[in-house]
Amino acid sequence: MPQAQPPRATRGQDERIVIETDCLAAEVWPNGYVSGVKANTLVDKKSSARDASFGLDIIDFLMGPGTEGGVAYEFNNLYHGKIAKHYLELPQVCTQAKHVESDFVVGGDFVVVRQWWRWRKAAPGYKPGSLWEQTLVFPMGRRYFISCDRVESVNDFKDVFLRTDLPGHLQHKRGDNFEEVYLSYEGRIPASDFLEDFPPDGRHLYQRGTHPLPSRMIRARKIKGEGKPWLAGITLDPAIVCEAWCHQRGYICFIQEIGRLPMKPGDSFAAAYLIGYFDSIEEMEREADRYRGLTSLAATKDYWLLSEGVILRDGDGRFRIAPQGQWPAPSPWRLVAHGKGEAEINGRRLKIDGEQTFEVPWAK
């Protein structure tokens, strides 16, 4: 049996990054409509399915709850419902940044892409410049990629969250291209429920604190057609999700918000996801359990690291795991490492060979 070709990544037209593994093809565009994986470019080689989205893991704003303390946010309408919020740092990354910095590296059995940008405007009393950084890892042998969004604050925030599209909005015409939606905190929902527009708080809304915390945070749609898979977004730590929408507004809006935590200047918070194709809900659950509770991703040419907390690079082969904002830190930290090489994390030297789970001590 012939061996699979190694993973590949190249720069194409307009600086786009073109990625290919044995299971997936994808593109990341740092110009135009930016962040995440470009709309309709995530191709499942097994089924030829595409994502039918506006993009996967797409980034918007830094926001806060309620009407006080920031730039006004329109609500009491069909698009935003009756949920009061305000903007803290803006503009919207996906539509208004126009260009984000990016790089990529090809490892032995994966491709890693990084994108980053700083918000240019801020609400009164705050300063602009908080950093958004996104890391995407495309492993061989998997029909999904691993993604992580990290925010590093330049402000003292009492209660901040990041708005994302996760896995990504679904473009459709009266349910023509999907059979059903699955939300782990609610269940299976037929396509017929998304024929007419309704607000995010009309139905299928998840809010941390008012809804039970699910054991898994899975949001997926079943692509229509014989042999077609589910496209899913799995947030590996359900507790980092503060709100999630699944409502119809000409398309199915899969907004997901992460955080709602206090931060000091220099603090970071992050969430990690699996995004891609699965043949069953049971398969999604197995992969969610495989990396349950992990929130942050970093990578070199030799290995990738998926950890609790927020993993930060301190130098060549040296990393530090920090708490999520001002939330208390567990001790020790759990870390999954994949690849081959050596890494120093919180002062502990790790030898990585294959995919292994480690415990790393707390370090200030």
Predicted regions and their residues:
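Short, Gly/Pro- and small/polar-rich lid/capping loops
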Residues: 2-14
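Beta-strand-rich recognition/accessory modules
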Residues: 12-22, 203-315, 340-349
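Acidic-aromatic substrate-binding/catalytic surfaces of carbohydrate-active enzymes
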Residues: 14-122
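Short, well-ordered beta-strand segments enriched in hydrophobic/aromatic residues
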Residues: 19, 23, 134, 145-153, ...
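Acidic, contiguous internal or C-terminal segments within carbohydrate-active enzymes
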Residues: 102-174
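Short, acidic/polar linear motifs in exposed loop/turn regions
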Residues: 153-157, 279, 325-327, 339
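Polysaccharide-binding surfaces and accessory modules of carbohydrate-active proteins
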Residues: 155-230, 347
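C-terminal beta-sandwich/jelly-roll accessory domains of carbohydrate-active enzymes
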Residues: 301-364
